Regions:
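An acidic, glycine-rich "communication" segment
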Residues: 1-62
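Extracellular ligand-binding/catalytic regions of CAZymes and related secreted enzymes
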Residues: 65, 74-80, 84-112
Length: 112
């Protein structure tokens, strides 16, 4: 397995043309605190999630289906989080996405 795929616990497979994508944080998950579902135009990434131990904390849905949109995992003594939305600035400016990103960074830094 390629090194980056092994590190991330999965790999990008494809995306359709940009469309309305709903980001669905898993309520009650610590990395989803302060976020709520929202829908914006984005690239809907389809992923092959290889790691059965990966902790999915957000899914994405569109007319093309549902996918794991964010997960976290431990690799050795390190932590990493993968978030697939964010190909348009409107996603980055959305308060719920900012909460997901900040929580992920805090968890990776062992502050959460």
């Amino acid at each position: 397995m390629p090194v980056l795929r092994s590190l991330l616990g999965g790999v990008f497979t494809h995306h359709p043309e940009q469309c309305l994508v709903t980001v669905n944080p898993h309520l009650g998950h610590p990395l989803s605190a302060g976020s709520a579902p929202f829908t914006l135009k984005d690239e809907h990434y389809f992923m092959a999630l290889d790691d059965p131990q990966a902790d999915v904390f957000m899914t994405t849905t569109s007319e093309h289906g549902e996918q794991p949109g964010a997960w976290r995992r431990v690799e050795g003594s390190g932590r990493l989080a993968v978030l697939t939305p964010g190909h348009n600035v409107e996603v980055w400016l959305h308060p719920s996405f900012q909460a997901l990103l900040l929580n992920s960074l805090r968890w990776c830094g062992k502050l959460l």
